[in-house]
Amino acid sequence: MLLMNLQLFAHKKGVGSSKNGRDSESKRLGTKCGDGQFVLAGNILVRQRGTKIHPGVNVGRGGDDTLYAKVDGIVKYERVGRSKKQASVYPVEIENVAE
């Protein structure tokens, strides 16, 4: 009887897949101004996809659902009902000190 000690090797070299190694740039979504923060008119409050947060008092909604302040004031994030959230900007009186 003939015994052969045989070791088989791979006939193709293992190579990393070219289907990996890509990723899209982050979109930098999220809140840009916190609750109670003073903002100027035109400042972006929230960048979002869809209306996770709805526009409230003195807040506008852009074409890409971005929320922005329409007046100078203080940002307030509020809950309306069980699940709806909204962002509002309430104007504040600023005293000008004449010197």
Swiss-Prot record:
Domain of life: Bacteria
One of the protein's GO biological processes: translation
Propiece span(s): 1-9
GO cellular component, one term: cytosolic large ribosomal subunit
GO MF term (any one): structural constituent of ribosome
Description of post-translational modifications: The N-terminus is cleaved by ribosomal processing cysteine protease Prp.
Keywords in alphabetical order: Ribonucleoprotein, Ribosomal protein
InterPro entries: Ribosomal_bL27, Ribosomal_bL27_CS
Gene3D superfamilies according to UniProt: 2.40.50.100
Family statement: Belongs to the bacterial ribosomal protein bL27 family.
Protein name per Swiss-Prot or TrEMBL: Large ribosomal subunit protein bL27
